[in-house]
Amino acid sequence: MKFSREKSQPIFDRAMNVMVKGVSSNFRFLGKNSTPVIAKGKGAHIWDADGNKFIDYRLGWGPIILGHADDRVSKEVSKYLENGTSFAATTELEVIVAEKIVAMVPGMEKLRFTNTGTEATMHALRTARGYTNKEKFIKFEGQYHGVHDYVMFSTASSPISAMGSKTSPIPVQVGSGIPNKIREYVYCLPFNDFNAVEKCLKDHHGEIAALLVEPCLGNIVGIEPQDGFLGHLRTLCDKYNVVLIFDEVKTGFRLSNGGARETYGVIPDISTYAKSLGNGIPVAAFGGKSEVMNVI
């Protein structure tokens, strides 16, 4: 089916003149003559600049868990906008939200707020390094943790042919501009491979600060952990003094109210949150055990 682009195309042509590929993320570019220009959204629907109506299955790549322009969210956000937006100081609203997260998420003791999922995973890794006085970390192939340099390896968009073998995986850099030396700090392993994780930690635990994992892979049609895999990670991290980080940017407040922690019954040392936390408002958080978080 072909839709009118009488209004959308001129807008996107202007975007191409002043924005790289006319978008704010490469994932949004669908071609010079087919990238949508959205005018509004309500509930599960969006409308483009020409008034064409669509069912929105992307929902902002995950954040819009309550639907676009939810009346309850819009009302509360509008109320707080009238009082100011950024004070560089503690507000009662922060405290209220933090208390709710601590109450909802099993094992959550203390947290910090930030703006994006990228920042949340970046802070979580830095906290783990500070707590353990070690520098390297493990991530899993196909998993996405944002766009800071340390996690831009072996994501779902990486060519499988470049990743090496199952027994000798190779971190595959995503995009350009990442210093070559950073690769030395990352171990990329196959997800759900019990033996690979155990061998890596046994051989390199003296230099590994953290194990960063999406409990359920969001960018690859929702691949779940095999029975016992997350518990296996917990046991190994305890044994080798490694901080277990759940990246719950996608799973948080979605798999269940308490996220993957509640759904799978495994408590990490730190979890990261964004997306569903704000229903499209840029807010994120990372938190976990007080002993670990207090090193910040």
Each predicted region: which residue ranges?
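Conserved N-terminal phosphate-binding loop of PLP-dependent enzymes in the Aspartate aminotransferase
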Residues: 1-296
